């Protein structure tokens, strides 16, 4: 039987194997906790660590233990004044195999705090959306970088060795340690050779010759002790990762908040906005998010008001498009910003206003936007009623004319989280760049 040894380093001195087993065991509870946090938190908070609370009863690992109401067992217990050897003790009547003094039958309400990493949060968030595996990997990757020279380092790969800086350090060290030079030693060797061939050498002459030989031997020993290139001299080219310079993008979130948009519809819309934000974050360093909500009138609001305000009323969709156009002209010129828009609605609109919406898109907004996505949130039972894309509300039919003319416009109906991802296939797939007409 083969044995597999996991030698991966544990992150931050924690047990990786135990962590993975816990995530697998408590996956449904963690998914529920993440869903609640996404529902109540900000769009930008999804792409970060999360501190998740879950009931403590779901933390312990399942174990085998003897049943408390059956079987025969022998114990060695400390002495006492109530029982003697041979006494029969009644079995405890606690249910469910609970052991220990005072074990109750109620469920513990204590909560367990668990910190999920960014990658684990995204895994749980993407699970309901049914994203392809490659798309999940791309969204979880950090921003793209390029290598840039950043000085020198004492360690590195042999292929990055800097010969010039290494020889410069070697030269300075040899000067500081007075390493004998080759010319000096060659001059002494030549002098020794000349004295050795001279005839009639006297005692003084022989003494001088011996001194030269000793000096040459001393210089050779010193030269061997001081190497030409020492490991301390070696320098390597150092590189650091520099983020690729990207342009800025602004993401407009438009949503109908009339009485017909319930909590289910708003939850699906928020998932759609979160996914679009994650896609854009992969492409741009800076992303501004503008929230515009509308009933019979529209206005720019903060995120909390956008999702949780109780305001309701009639429905005039064109007011949201007019507000978006006003904000673009005031703060986000198209020559400096990449403009993306996502509109969520149930399709209800006042009579005659849908044509006004199509006109605003045709004449103004589609010329400014890199991409405009419209999602119509319907009930799952309505998916059979709207069998073809031509059927639908007046707003859907009006937007179909825009979809036919502008390649950077995408529209779809969603009834469940798994329907959200197809909206992004055309936008982020490999395709020719969209030519926005002027």
Curated annotation (Swiss-Prot):
Compositional bias per record (Gly residues), positions renumbered to this chain: 94-105
Transmembrane segments: none
Cleaved signal peptide residues: none
Positions with biased composition (Basic and acidic residues): 1-16
InterPro entries in alphabetical order: UPF0229
UniProt superkingdom: Bacteria
The protein's name in its UniProt record: UPF0229 protein NGR_c12350
């Amino acid at each position: 039987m083969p044995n597999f040894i996991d030698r991966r380093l544990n992150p931050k001195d924690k047990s990786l194997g135990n962590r993975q087993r816990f995530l697998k065991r408590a996956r449904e509870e963690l998914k529920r906790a993440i869903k609640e946090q996404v529902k109540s938190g900000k769009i930008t908070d999804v792409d970060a660590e999360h501190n998740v609370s879950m009931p403590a009863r779901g933390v312990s690992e399942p174990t085998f233990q003897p049943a408390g109401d059956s079987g025969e067992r022998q114990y060695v217990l400390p002495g006492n004044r109530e029982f003697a050897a041979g006494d029969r003790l009644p079995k405890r009547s606690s249910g469910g195999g609970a052991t220990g003094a005072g074990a109750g039958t109620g469920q513990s309400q204590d909560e367990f705090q668990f910190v999920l990493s960014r990658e684990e949060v995204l895994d749980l968030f993407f699970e309901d959306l049914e994203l392809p595996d490659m798309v999940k990997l791309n969204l979880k990757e950090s921003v793209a970088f390029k290598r840039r020279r950043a000085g020198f380092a004492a360690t590195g790969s042999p292929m990055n060795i800097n010969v010039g800086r290494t020889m410069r350090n070697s030269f300075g060290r040899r000067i500081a340690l007075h390493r004998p030079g080759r010319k000096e030693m060659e001059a002494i060797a030549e002098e020794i050779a000349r004295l050795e061939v001279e005839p009639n050498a006297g005692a003084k002459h022989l003494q001088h010759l011996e001194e030269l030989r000793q000096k040459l031997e001393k210089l050779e020993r010193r030269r061997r002790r001081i190497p030409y290139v020492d490991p301390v001299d070696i320098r390597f080219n150092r590189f650091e990762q520099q983020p690729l310079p990207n342009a800025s993008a602004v993401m407009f979130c438009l949503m109908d908040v009339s009485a017909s948009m319930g909590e289910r519809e708003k939850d699906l819309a928020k998932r759609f906005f979160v996914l679009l934000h994650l896609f854009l974050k992969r492409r741009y360093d800076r992303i501004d998010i503008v929230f515009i909500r509308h009933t019979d009138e529209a206005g720019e609001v903060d995120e909390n008001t956008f999702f949780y305000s109780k305001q309701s009323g009639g429905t005039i969709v064109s007011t949201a498009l007019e507000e978006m156009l006003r904000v673009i002209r005031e703060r986000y010129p198209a020559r400096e910003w990449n403009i993306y828009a996502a509109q969520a609605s149930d399709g209800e609109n006042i009579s005659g206003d849908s044509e006004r919406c199509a006109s605003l898109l045709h004449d103004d907004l589609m010329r400014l936007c890199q991409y405009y996505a419209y999602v119509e949130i319907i009930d799952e039972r309505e998916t059979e009623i709207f069998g073809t894309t031509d059927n639908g509300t007046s707003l859907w039919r009006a937007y179909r004319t825009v979809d036919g003319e502008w390649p950077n416009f995408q529209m779809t109906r969603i009834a469940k989280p798994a329907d959200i991802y197809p909206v992004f296939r055309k936008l982020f797939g490999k395709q020719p760049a969209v030519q926005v007409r002027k």
